[in-house]
Amino acid sequence: MDAAFTAEQDEIRRTLRELLAKRSGPDDVRSAVRTADGYDETLWRQLAQDLGLPGLALPQEYGGVGCGLAELAVACEETGRALLPSPLIATAALAAPLIAALGTEAQRTALLPRIAAGRLTATLAVPGGSLATALGLTGDPTGGAWAGGGRAGGIQARPVGGAEGWRLYGEAAQVLDGHSAGLLLVAAHAGGFPRSRTLLFLVRPDTAAGIVRARRTSLDETRPLARIELRDTEAELLGADDTVDVIDALAPAGRGVAVLLAAEAVGAAASALERTVEYVKTREQFGRAIGSFQAVKHRLADLYVRVQAARSAAYYAAWAPAAGSLALAQALESLRITAAEAVQLHGGIGFTWEHEAHLYFKRAAADELLFGPVHRLRDHVAQQAGLFGPPNGQPPSSSAFAAPGSAEQVAV
């Protein structure tokens, strides 16, 4: 393993950091989240056209840059530093990989070039608040209970025959960027008990009838959530086979999402720490900078070690996505603790609405609610590794920790 960044990765980091330093400061973030879409459309188009950000990990044959998950993780670390409100995670992490993996050639050709060019945003909608379970990050996704079915509610799909395809009925309560996405990938339950399965469907909100989208008040305004109601809504099956359950395909996508979220959290934690260090260097008390006090130094040193450890885990996961869940747990924990200490070390001003410290704290809390929490992420990995006994009657496995081509070596 060569842990050094390539020249291309360094250039992605440098270019994004310079641009976001100019265009995504705390005041810019506050302005962007209060728009109808919840992000700066002009900046998003610039990131797409000049840097190819949404298509960074998409194949060149579909208009993408042709890089991999590692390059996208480097970019996400920088967007995390700036707390950039954008549809990047929803579009490039949740939706695009599923379209690329499961879509027909016609669907990939029609959708992926538009996503790569920034002309189309997309997101994944799953019933209730079960996104982390559906992605295989927490709980047990294999049974598909999160998708509903029968009396379990969720979102139901029924074929209508002919050219009309499918109709969906149900509700998704927490859809990331669901109020503004131009395309929804909806996970729905189909079939009765003998043929019960979970399928993915394409819903185009601008043209489909029977869809109601409402932006919800969210803890973190940079992570806008929406409630999606589907009332006999027209939908197109993603892929060509309506007999194959997609649950197994969601787990690889979940590992990629975990890697990118971990990178974002590390970037946010590092930024919060840097801002706090700069503040304690200039804030004076008792005739000297508060950063010169030993108690403050020790707290900042502990935070630095925590952030660096989380960064190391995130970088490893970008190379070995199977470690994504553990990296995400460590990164979210690091961000939560660092953001809380940032508020405390800023003193009274850190508790004011005008200061940016609370933006980092809200990002930490909201991401844990949506994709965690931390203890469930770790518990899920432990269960899968068989630390509490063989999972589902299977022999213990170290696959949750293994690197590509490492013959299931455990990364310690």
Spans of model-derived segments:
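A short core secondary-structure module
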Residues: 125, 165, 171-211
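N-terminal glycine-rich flavin-associated loop
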Residues: 86-106
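A short, Trp-centered hydrophobic/proline-enriched beta-strand micro-motif
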Residues: 117-134
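Cytochrome P450 C-terminal beta-domain/meander region
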Residues: 149-169
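Alpha-helical interface subdomain recognition
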Residues: 1-80, 114, 118, 252-412
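Structural signature of FAD isoalloxazine-binding scaffolds in flavoprotein oxidoreductases
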Residues: 66-75, 148-153, 203
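FAD-binding glycine-rich core of flavoenzymes that anchor FAD
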Residues: 102-122
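Flexible, small-/acidic-enriched active-site or ligand-binding loops
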Residues: 137-146, 174-177, 204-239
